[in-house]
Amino acid sequence: MNLLRKIAMPVMRILLVLAFQIFFAALCSAAPAAAPDDVPRSIAPYFKTATSSPKAPDADGFLQRWLLLEPINKPNRSNTVFTDSYVRNAFNTEYFPNQSTVIPHDGDKVKVGDQELAWHALDSANFNVKLFRFAYGLNKPTYGVIFWAVTIVNSPREMQNVRLAAGSNSASIWWVNGQEAVDLFDDRRMVMDDVVSKRLTLHRGRNVIRGAVINGPGLSDFCVRFIDENGDPIKDLTVSLDNAGK
């Protein structure tokens, strides 16, 4: 009897293992998981198309409405190369005509080498503009890229002694009305108010904010807002792209 038990127990264990393997194989074949490439990509829920109505900053003063250009290929295996000189050289290279002055329309296209890239007028769902999700959702390159961003901030009056506060992943430079305001170099994570500009003046009416963000491997995003002398966010601004390009 003991001999039969010693023989039967291992056999039963083997049969039990085989039964589980067959069960799980049948389960997987009945409901195969969709491969990543089979899943339709979208920029939702991170972005939605900007409307013609002026948009105020969010509750903390962050600018969420931007014209974003699809990413320009700029291969980099590491973000450690993003020194002052490297980043400035990358952004001073002319990839498309009037890149430092153009105020595009939604849907405008530019030619960069063999890339045809479009501008998109979008509202970010978050305080930080998720460039990686923007590129991924449009089936564009996500690593080793440069993003250009433009927005138009309308001020109800002249505002003196304000500061532009920005954070980005990875390196970036930001301009206000054609003048460089802040620069962020090296391999860095996106941190709120990571770098703050010197005191500057917002004109009554239209002010053009322009930025360029470069990244190698990893996620890309940025956040931008204006703060006053006390470091408090300036909220009585609006962003409107309905006159972009005019």
Report the location of each language-model feature.
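N-terminal secretory signal peptides that target proteins for export/translocation
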Residues: 1-13
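Bacterial N-terminal signal peptides
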Residues: 13-29
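Accessory carbohydrate-binding/adhesion or oligomerization-edge regions at the termini
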Residues: 31-129, 211-246
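Short structured motifs
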Residues: 133-137, 148-150, 193-197
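Short beta-strands within extracellular/lumenal beta-sheet-rich domains
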Residues: 142-154
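Non-cytosolic beta-sheet module surface loops
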Residues: 155, 164-168, 213-215
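Aromatic-lined ligand-binding clefts that engage carbohydrates, nucleic acids, or primary amines
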Residues: 160-175, 209
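Beta-strand-rich ligand-recognition modules
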Residues: 176-225
